[in-house]
Amino acid sequence: SGRRGGPLREDEDDVALNQSFVAWNPYRAGDDHVTLRAGRQELEFGLSRLLSTREGLNTRQSFDGLRSFGRLGRWNYNTTLVRPVETLPGAFDDRAEAGGRYGGASVWTANPLLPAGNTTVYANHRRKRDVPFDIGRGTDLRNTFGIRFWSVNPALDYNWEGGVQRGNFEGLAIRAWYFASDTGYTFAGRAGRPRLGLRVDATSGDRDPNDGELNTFNALFASTAYSGLAGQLGPANANDVAPSLSFSPRPNLRVTLGAIGFWRMSPDDGIYSATGSLRRDGQSSSARHIGNQFTAQLV
């Protein structure tokens, strides 16, 4: 595969059933509705910062379990109780992760205090065995509490999100945090509708391997496109700054040019991949700067 350490487990899956579920709508009145869903399904919420279909790798992420979502009055809601599906290389052999689980709930509504804004609050729980961190591997029990402010205003668009994580990792208290933002302004009256954008993200890293805490942020099932379409780095012990310019030279073409700079949040913690594996330990270098990436995308 050309990858150091060989192919990832997610790189091969001959034939798989990504989605197979039953759905029921027990309530519908005007715009209000409730949907219940059970079975194997893909899940993706918000900007995929914590839960996504793993777009960018060779196989997609599915989940087995229950989901309820809908709208009641001015409130939208989503709840899930599922087990992640492990990717295996054969035909129809993917299975629910042993000892793993994921559950979460979120509500969102329009926010009159923000320009064309909306607010989402959420909480989730994740249990996973054999999770790799710079301090070692073990069972990770983690609760995430977050809030997101977002808008799809034709001129000013923004997505700002942040939160904390608490839990336990092999007797260590988990105390992690994260912040993510993507802000842009589109000059709708100009030729090509140019958009200037700026993304700034920061995720905590472990400060001291001997203080009885684990401070490394766990991005759970985040989109692998965090570090661009190549998906080489993940949002753990990292911060980045990414300016961009988008424009349409013709009606059916959108061009985006950008640059991304990556740094370690803590020089005492390692560098993590988009799937959460440890790519470099924190003891081999004290440098914070990881590297830069330049991107060009035509859609």
Annotate each language-model stretch with its function.
Residues 236-278:
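Exposed, low-structure sequence patches enriched in small/polar residues
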Residues 28-36, 50, 54-213, 248, ...:
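Signature for the C-terminal beta-barrel architecture of outer-membrane proteins
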Residues 99-106, 224, 228-248:
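Outer-membrane beta-barrel signature, preferentially recognizing the C-terminal barrel domain
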Residues 15-19, 193-194, 217:
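A broad structural signal for short, well-ordered beta-strand segments within beta-sheet-rich domains
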Residues 2-63:
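Well-ordered mid-protein domain cores that form the structural environment of catalytic cofactors
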Residues 214-235, 266-284:
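Flexible internal linker/loop segments at domain or repeat junctions
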